[in-house]
Amino acid sequence: MNNQINDFVSKYDGEQFATGAGREIHAKLQKIYLSPTKVGDAELIAKIENAGDELQSFFMENSKAEVPIAGFINNEFLSRRIDRLVVDDATKTVRVLDYKTDINTDKFRDKYIAKMNEYIKLLQKIYPDYKISGYILWLHNWTLEYII
């Protein structure tokens, strides 16, 4: 019985973190820039800097936060918001970053990959000659995962 209670509490705590903290962290992350000067929450900036160069590149002056995107995929109209977008015209690349607060990274993985595929398909219509890639930032442990 005790294990069942622990499992329930653990699940509840994880869901609470994913929803409650998720909104707060998202709001702070959209205001962070690392260059030309550091702007935003100092604690989150430190986590981004400690996570490595690849993650830091999503928070430079050429990045955009909370980017709306809409269009048709298979005759269905979709309207989405990209957490972080970096377009580099010199290298003809587009990189998408989606923040996720889930502790159990496998639970919604298929759903998140499908969402990333939607972003990619919509962006391919805007940037047909660019290489587009997508990443998830798992906020519970600050792991950057390449998806597509």
Question: Which role does the model predict for each range below?
Answer:
Residues 76-148:
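Mg2+/Mn2+-dependent nuclease catalytic core
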Residues 1-82, 88, 112-114:
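Nuclease catalytic cores
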